[in-house]
From Swiss-Prot:
Keywords: DNA-binding, Fatty acid biosynthesis, Fatty acid metabolism, Lipid biosynthesis, Lipid metabolism, Repressor, Transcription, Transcription regulation. Pfam families: 4HBT (PF03061). GO terms for biological process: fatty acid biosynthetic process; negative regulation of DNA-templated transcription; negative regulation of fatty acid biosynthetic process. InterPro entries: HotDog_dom_sf, Thioestr_dom, Transcription_factor_FapR, WH-like_DNA-bd_sf, WH_DNA-bd_sf. This is Transcription factor FapR. It comes from Caldanaerobacter subterraneus subsp. tengcongensis (strain DSM 15242 / JCM 11007 / NBRC 100824 / MB4) (Thermoanaerobacter tengcongensis). GO terms for molecular function: DNA binding; DNA-binding transcription factor activity. It comes from the Bacteria.
Length: 200
């Protein structure tokens, strides 16, 4: 949207864009409208629209209530979309304490944790475990990158869920994982751990 418009029209369009996609950053909106980031911030303040972090947090809080297998607070990143047994999306922004000091590259354990917790969130059962994980780190991640993870249940066979997770930074895929998760019933928590089969 390179054409300049009046302030009133820009604010109308801004509200429309944010309603369509609440995850646009001020930088992205400034580029869309051909104005400064400060102008977008002022427009948002006048319209009473919170910043992107607050918008993401609001959407995530609604989705955390749907999760059955783990606590919402255990999901790594913000859970912005969830359809139990089908698909989900989370957003995660690594911080400085999550990197290797020498290279400033985000440690793989945090990226894996985002994928694992999103996969677990999809399962419509009281508890679940990862039985098998086939993962691939495809590109290094740095602080400031916004990781968008999309997970989908590809098929279900009995109590086993086959889940694919792809994590991207912008349009570049940085991680891919195929998981087999085993759904566990409530009585699992009462059994000894050596009586439950997870793999195969």
């Amino acid at each position: 949207m390179a054409v300049r418009v009046s302030k009133a029209e820009r604010q109308r369009l801004l509200r429309e864009k944010i309603n369509e996609n609440p995850f646009y950053t001020d930088d992205e909106l400034a580029d869309m409208f051909g104005v400064s980031v400060q102008t977008i911030r002022l427009d948002r303040m006048e319209l009473g629209i919170p910043e992107v972090r607050e918008r993401i947090k609001n959407v995530a809080e609604e989705n955390y209530r749907k999760v059955k297998t783990i606590l919402g607070a255990e999901v790594v990143g913000e859970l912005i979309d969830l359809e139990l047994g089908k698909r989900g999306i989370s957003i995660f922004e690594p911080t400085e304490d999550m990197v290797f000091v020498k290279t400033k590259i985000v440690k793989g354990q945090y990226i894996y944790s985002q994928a694992e917790s999103l996969a677990l969130s999809l399962i419509d059962a009281p508890a679940a475990l990862i039985g098998v994980a086939n993962i691939k780190y495809k590109y290094p991640v740095k602080v400031g990158d916004r990781l968008v993870a999309k997970a989908e249940v590809i098929r279900q066979r009995g109590n086993k869920y086959f889940v694919w997770v792809k994590i991207k930074v912008k349009e570049k895929e940085v991680f891919r994982g195929k998981f087999i998760l085993v759904a566990l019933e409530e009585d699992f928590l009462k059994k000894r751990s050596d009586t439950v089969e997870v793999g195969n």
